[in-house]
Amino acid sequence: MASQTIRIRLKSYEHGILDESAAKIVATAKRTGAEISGPVPLPTERTLFTVLRSPHKNKDSREQFEMRTHKRLIDILNPTPKTVDSLMKLDLPSGVDIEIKL
């Protein structure tokens, strides 16, 4: 029988909240006896927006805004039923997007 792996991808605009959430997930999985691989920092996505400062003229005067999306990857190897239950009950901040694949 092949071993089961849970892959968790975390995304957030703020890296502090993201690292805190990853630490909570790792601590919960280790407490229940599962093996952990990660958190692995994935490349940061950078989206740049360029906007005219004035509403009608001055094409040379522009302002740039950027949005960074930080990502982390955590693999949980050989999870126990207790691990899955504790991960379901885990309370994480609202600014973190979580994607779980079995």
UniProtKB/Swiss-Prot annotation:
Q: Which GO biological-process labels does this protein carry? A: translation
Protein family (similarity comment): Belongs to the universal ribosomal protein uS10 family.
Q: Does the keyword Electron transport apply?
A: no
A cellular component term (GO) from this record? ribosome
The UniProt entry, under HAMAP family, shows: Ribosomal_uS10 (MF_00508)
- Name the UniProt record assigns to this protein: Small ribosomal subunit protein uS10
Q: Which PANTHER family match?
A: 30S RIBOSOMAL PROTEIN S10 FAMILY MEMBER
Keyword RNA-binding recorded:
no
Query: What NCBIfam families does the database record attribute to this sequence?
Result: PRK00596.1, rpsJ_bact
One example of the protein's molecular function in GO is: structural constituent of ribosome
PROSITE patterns xref list? RIBOSOMAL_S10
Q: Give the species this sequence originates from.
A: Lactobacillus acidophilus (strain ATCC 700396 / NCK56 / N2 / NCFM)
The source's domain of life comes to Bacteria
Pfam families the record matches: Ribosomal_S10
**Assembly information from the UniProt record:** Part of the 30S ribosomal subunit.
Q: Which UniProt keywords apply?
A: Ribonucleoprotein, Ribosomal protein
